[in-house]
C-alpha cells in the first residue's frame, strides 16, 4: 500500500548543516524518513550540490527536486541585497523569490500531495497558491521580532531605520501569509502564543527543540576538573554571517571580554562558524585578543569538547537556539542571556546560568571558571534533563503526527485558494 505523500518546500539547500534552521529541519526530516509519509523535498541547489550531498539527501527524503541557482559574485550579490531592501517585501523574502521555483512547486501541487510543508514563512513567496487543506508552515522564529531586536540594539541611526523598516515589512508578511496555511508549527509556546494573538493563525501547534544525541553524545565528556587560574577556554558556535551572532560577538568583544581579561588575562575564546566578517576578525587581532575564528568546520564537536564553558551572549534572536542543547548534550556548562535561552524549558541555576548585563556575564563566567565542580554538576543536570525529553527522534514523531492530522482526506478536491504576493 502506497504511503501518503508529503511535499516539503525549503527556501534553502539543507547541506552543509551549518545553521540552526538547517540543523533543525534536517533532524526532523531524518527522523521522519521511512515513516508514515513518502517525503519529496524541494529546494534550491546548484548543479553540483545534489551529487555532492547525495548520501545526506537520501537520509532525509525519498525524492529530491530542485530549482537551479548559481553562485553570484560579491558585487552582484551586493546589488541584489540593495534591490531587496527597496522591495515591498522583507529583504530576506525578496531574495528567496524565484519564478522557476514557483513553477516547479505548482507542478508538484498539481499532483495533489497529501500534505504540503513550507519551511519558514519565507517559503510562502514561492507558492502561487497555498492549498486550503493539508498545508503546513513550519516557523522557526517570529521573524518580525528578530528585526525589532536588531532595531533596538543598533547604535547607528541609519541601521535602526533599516531594521525598523524590515520589521514592519516582515510583520505585514507574516500577518498576511501565516493564516493562509491550515496549520502553523511553532518551536516554542512563546512563539505559539504570539502567532495566535497577533496574527490570528488557525490550527497552530508547537513542537519542542530537539538535539541529535547519537551524534553529540558520542563525543560527550565531563568538563575539565581543573582550569588554569590565569586562563580558561570559552566557546561560541553559530553561523558568523548571521547578524544576531555577529552582534553577540561584538558585544562580547567590546563589553564582556575586557572584564574577564582583567582577572584571567590568558583566557581564550574560540568562535566556530562559517564566514566571520573580516572586520571583526581584524578587530580581535588588532586588540591582541586571545581569540580564534575557525570559519566553517565539518565537525563542531571537538571544539565544544575542548572548551571549559559554552557562552551565548545573544542580544538578538527569535525561536529557540539548538546550540544550547548541543552544548548540553556534550556536557558543557552554559552561560547565556535570557534571549539565548528564550523558549527553552530549562531551569536557571540547575541547567544553565543566566546573565543579562556585561558585568553579570563576565562575573558568572569567572565564577564557573573558579569552581569547575559547580559547572560540571550543572552540565550533568542539563544533560540528563534533555536526554530524557528532547531527542530528535521524539521531536520528529511529534512533527509527523501534526502532519498526519493535517493530511488531506475527504476535502482534497476543494479548489486551492490563491495567495496574492506583495512586492
Task: Set out the residue ranges of the language-model regions.
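Conserved acidic donor-binding segment of nucleotide-sugar-dependent glycosyltransferases
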Residues: 352-359, 367-372
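Acidic anion/phosphate-binding donor-loop and adjacent secondary structure
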Residues: 148, 211-227, 281
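A short, well-ordered alpha-helix in the C-terminal region of glycosyltransferases
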Residues: 374-388, 395
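Acceptor-binding helix/loop patch of EC 2.4 sugar-transfer enzymes
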Residues: 11, 75-94, 136-172, 239
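Short hydrophobic beta-strand element within catalytic cores of glycosyltransferases
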Residues: 323-326, 333-337
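Carbohydrate-associated surface elements
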Residues: 190, 207-210
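Acidic donor-binding loop of glycosyltransferase active sites
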Residues: 182, 305-319, 330-333
